């Protein structure tokens, strides 16, 4: 029996009607390669489930019980697009130093060995999509420790250490941004903390996916030696049809995490000593307003996030 499917990718829809129930998921991917130029190993097909898990390449399409004209979202980037994305920017590109680090340290973003590490992460690091990326939305990448909660103070529950206005902040941000959590810890810890804070179960917003320390890379800097950083190129390389340097912003309390993407980082004030500061910390409340203001811009890379408060005061005074 012939199947009729509609594949959504890169803002376009591709109808497929040449496949049968005896064909496999891999056959489907090869058909898509001829239409999109994306290699099968670069593809991720959302919605194709078999026994509660993503369907493997050898699963026959017939057992998936697909209805006629089922729409399936495909993720993946062409090789040539990936190479272009991973390439260092032109020499005349001006990069604004968004945080207090030495200028020579910023140069690490252009080094071949660091770009090669990102390419390996794009190829090898597995991301579990919790909620599909939404077309037309910008990307907000959030650190956890000291950004969303105080992880050092003692308390009976995580709620006591949660940064004020966290859920209000995420609810507002979700209107304009897909939300990704990236912590320099293990995925098991991240999942537990998001559950404890009520983030993963909140019905007012959704987390697109989460990244752990394995998605980070180590870079060498002239004065600081080896440091671990969070390269946004890993996300852009995997989901370039949705996210890029022009529509992404990352919050972190550690400036060096932006070394590979200084233009996209906003250094948030760390939330510490929750019991003393819970009633006066309004960082997320103000940043929520900033995100709302800049969400209307076509290109976030032209902003200097170091001066986000100055930008907000200026906009609200108009």
UniProtKB/Swiss-Prot annotation:
Q: What is known of its domains?
A: The Ubiquitin-like domain mediates interaction with proteasomes.
Question: What the protein does?
Answer: Dephosphorylates 26S nuclear proteasomes, thereby decreasing their proteolytic activity. Recruited to the 19S regulatory particle of the 26S proteasome where it dephosphorylates 19S component psmc2 which impairs psmc2 ATPase activity and disrupts 26S proteasome assembly. Has also been reported to stimulate the proteolytic activity of the 26S proteasome.
Residue intervals of the Ubiquitin-like domain: 3-81
What are the protein's GO molecular function terms? Answer: metal ion binding; protein serine/threonine phosphatase activity
| Reactions this protein catalyses | O-phospho-L-seryl-[protein] + H2O = L-seryl-[protein] + phosphate; O-phospho-L-threonyl-[protein] + H2O = L-threonyl-[protein] + phosphate
Query: What is the source species?
Result: Xenopus tropicalis
The record, for InterPro entries, names: FCP1_dom, HAD-like_sf, HAD-SF_hydro_IIID, HAD_sf, Ubiquitin-like_dom, Ubiquitin-like_domsf, UBLCP1
Which named protein is this? Answer: Ubiquitin-like domain-containing CTD phosphatase 1
- EC number(s) per UniProt? 3.1.3.16
Q: What is its main location?
A: nucleus
Instruction: Enumerate the UniProt keywords alphabetically.
Output: Hydrolase, Magnesium, Metal-binding, Nucleus, Protein phosphatase
